[in-house]
């Protein structure tokens, strides 16, 4: 039985991905910083799909050492894994009101952590007897291609994740690395949690500007999950970013077109 690791899986898109893969007989390790919703999500999957389907592991991606612990937990608990889903994200805005820690955490969670997790997963698969075919899918954002002043660090990190994915097609002959880049999602980030208090207004200070631009019609979490599953199952996808738009559908980018 295949096993998938999913970061940011306690709710929203991550949980939808977990459900979609569980329906395809995957075992799931859900990781998240939410120690209430995470275990509850794992319990629900076990109730629906059978005991042993899912396990929860607390993982704060702002600390890369916790990624090592997540992979070790999965290997010890599930006997290994064949799929890594880098779904977790972190967004704070507006840009000109951010602290140094806000900026650092956005870059780490949205860019450095997926890069490091992918590297460690590939090294794990490469070290297995005769090697093992593996699959990595990262959930980036339409901000990879077009971003806004108030969320500039987030957009920069997501653009980096897309560029990393384009290059990743050459990493290993048996490992496929792809990404999905959705526009605004119906659940999305909690606007109140993402805001940093400020009395200033204007470019770089107004987090609603990108919501207006991106949120005319929002994707459903299930639509994003379906695209992730496509990346997992389609053996012909290498180093691609699937841009998801609620109106225009899916566009596949390879870094050259």
UniProtKB/Swiss-Prot annotation:
GO terms for biological process: helvolic acid biosynthetic process; secondary metabolic process. Residues 1-22 form the signal peptide. Keywords: Glycoprotein, NADP, Oxidoreductase, Signal. Pathway: Mycotoxin biosynthesis. Induction: Expression is under the control of the secondary metabolism regulator laeA. Expression up-regulated upon exposure to exogenous gliotoxin. Its EC number is 1.1.1.-. InterPro entries: NAD(P)-bd_dom_sf (IPR036291), Sc_DH/Rdtase_CS (IPR020904), SDR_fam (IPR002347). The active site is at 154 (proton acceptor), 158 (lowers pka of active site tyr). GO terms for cellular component: cytoplasm. GO terms for molecular function: oxidoreductase activity, acting on the CH-OH group of donors, NAD or NADP as acceptor. NADP(+) binds at residues 13, 60, 87, 154, 158, 185, 187. PROSITE patterns: ADH_SHORT. SUPFAM superfamilies: NAD(P)-binding Rossmann-fold domains. The keyword Glycoprotein applies. It holds the Pfam family adh_short. Glycans are attached at residues 46, 110. PANTHER family: 15-HYDROXYPROSTAGLANDIN DEHYDROGENASE [NAD(+)]. Short chain dehydrogenase; part of the gene cluster that mediates the biosynthesis of helvolic acid, an antibacterial nortriterpenoid. Protostadienol synthase helA cyclizes (3S)-oxidosqualene to (17Z)-protosta-17(20),24-dien-3-beta-ol (protostadienol). The synthesis of protostadienol is followed by several steps of monooxygenation, dehydrogenation, and acyl transfer to yield the final helvolic acid. Belongs to the short-chain dehydrogenases/reductases (SDR) family. This is Short chain dehydrogenase helC. It comes from Aspergillus fumigatus (strain ATCC MYA-4609 / CBS 101355 / FGSC A1100 / Af293) (Neosartorya fumigata). The lineage of its organism: Eukaryota, Fungi, Dikarya, Ascomycota, Pezizomycotina.
